[in-house]
Each structure stands twice: as C-alpha cells, then as structure tokens.
Design a protein with these regions (language model features):
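N-terminal "mature head" segments of proteins
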Residues: 2-116
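A short beta-strand motif characteristic of beta-propeller blades
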Residues: 54-68, 96-104, 141-147, 180-183, ...
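Repeated scaffold domains used in trafficking and secretory/extracellular systems
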Residues: 63-77, 104-118, 148-161, 190-205, ...
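Short beta-strand elements that form the blades of beta-propeller/WD-repeat-like
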Residues: 73-85, 115-127, 132-133, 155-173, ...
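Hydrophobic/aromatic beta-strand positions that recur at structurally equivalent sites within the blades
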Residues: 93, 133-136, 173-176, 226-229
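Well-ordered mid-protein domain cores that form the structural environment of catalytic cofactors
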Residues: 112, 130-147
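A charged, solvent-exposed segment within the mature domains of Sec-exported extracytoplasmic proteins
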Residues: 142-190
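Acidic, serine/threonine- and glycine-rich low-complexity intrinsically disordered segments
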Residues: 183-238
Length: 238
C-alpha cells in the first residue's frame, strides 16, 4: 500500500501563489469591467405597452422634443415608448413626454435597437463594439448581457426577431437571450477549420424572421447570400 502524499513547503508556496494570482486576475477583471461604471435607474413601476396607433390621425402637432445623438437614421420606439440617447445616457420616454427610466454609461455607444420588448445597446470596449446590454422597455430592468470580440466599426442588423451587427469583415445576430445564432465572415479565433466558406468583404446585411441576407464582394465576383437565422451550428452558415 502506498503511503499517503504529504504536502511539502513548496506545495504550499505554489498553492499560495496560484491563489494570489487568481485573486489578482479576478479583482482586475471586476474593477476594469466596462459595465462597472454603468448606472441604471429603472422605472418606478412597469409601464403599459403603448403599442401602435390603430388609425392614422388626420393632423399632427408637436407634443415634445428630445435630443438624440445615437446616430440612428430613424426614431427608436419600444413598447410604444421613445428611446433616445444623449450625454452618454439612454432614456425611455412615454407618449406624454415623461422619462420613466435611464441607463448611463461612459463607453461609446456603437448601436442601439429594439426587439422582444427590449432595448438592446451595443457599446465599445477594448475588444471592439462587442459589449451588449438588453433592458426591458417597460420596466427599465436588465434583461441580458453579452460580451465578445467584435469589429471597431459596425452597422445595425436587426428586426423584431433578431438583433446583431454587420461590418465589412463579419456579421452576426442574436436571439432574445443574446445568444448568438449566426456568425458569418471573418472569425478572430477559429475553433475549427472550414466553418466559414466565404471570408469576403461584406457590403450590406438584413435580417427578417428566420432569414439573414448578406451581400458581399469576393475575388471571383459579387454575391447575395441567403441563410437561416437559426442554423444547427451558429459558426457554420446554412
């Protein structure tokens, strides 16, 4: 019968060093996390879903105005509330002009969209425009987060069923829990070879329900690619 192993002084020192390094790394990650400086003020109570007008009014008059520097080319409305961005702050405002929740964060805002009754904001960190937060539009409470390596310059890629981004290098979309369902184009750290058949220059991208469409320019010409929004493997387009 073998004698039991005994801990030596060297073992204890090694264990202490490993524990110390682990604690240092965890502490560094905590204190340097981009979301640490975020400040969310939720709604005092859940708001009603204001929905959409059933009949187009015969005339319009301005009820109120809000500054918006999000860079969007059209207003953003979620659950009937107007979502705006100004001075590093996202705000949700009712049709009566009352601001019911705000989300402030010092990081640069890359994109903001809405889907599934949530506001989805994408921020820049030290790994590109890949730090994402979802906020329930009616309550102003956190509804999900994700963080991944992403390009520095991205454009909107969203519908009522999917949200994501597109760039000249790659495109990806996420489902309601912010889990990625499609990854197309250049992959920074490939886990398996030959998963991406066309690493070309993407010129535009759209998504609707269960479809993702991408136009791109390759060495052998220009192409329109249609693929499923929920393939069997998110890393391999179908």
């Amino acid at each position: 019968m073998n004698s039991p192993l005994r801990r030596t002084r060297g073992d204890l020192i090694a264990t202490g060093v490993i524990a110390g390094v682990s604690a240092l790394l965890l502490g560094t990650a905590f204190f340097t996390a981009p979301a640490r400086d975020a400040h969310l003020v939720a709604a005092e109570e859940e708001q009603e879903d204001y929905g959409q007008l059933a009949v187009v009014p015969k005339s319009f008059s301005e009820g109120f105005s809000l500054p918006d520097t999000s860079g969007r080319d059209q207003p953003l409305v979620a659950s009937g509330m107007v979502i705006t961005y100004n001075d590093n702050t996202l705000s949700a405002t009712t049709p009566e002009g009352e601001t019911v929740w705000t989300y402030e964060r010092p990081n640069e805002l890359c994109l903001v969209d809405q889907a599934w009754g949530k506001v989805v904001a994408t921020y820049r960190d030290n790994a590109g425009c890949g730090d994402v937060v979802a906020i329930d539009a009616k309550t102003g409470k956190y509804a999900g987060t994700r963080s991944a390596i992403a390009p520095d310059k991205v454009v909107r890629l969203a519908s009522n069923d999917r949200v994501g981004y597109a760039s000249s290098e790659r495109a990806e979309v996420w489902r309601s829990d912010l889990v990625r369902t499609v990854e197309y184009g250049h992959v920074e750290a490939k886990q398996e070879p030959d998963m991406q058949p066309n690493e070309c220059t993407i010129t535009s991208a759209l998504t609707r329900t269960e479809l993702v469409a991408v136009t791109e320019i390759c060495d052998d010409g220009a192409f329109l690619r249609l693929q499923e929004a929920t393939p069997e493997d998110s890393r391999k387009p179908e």
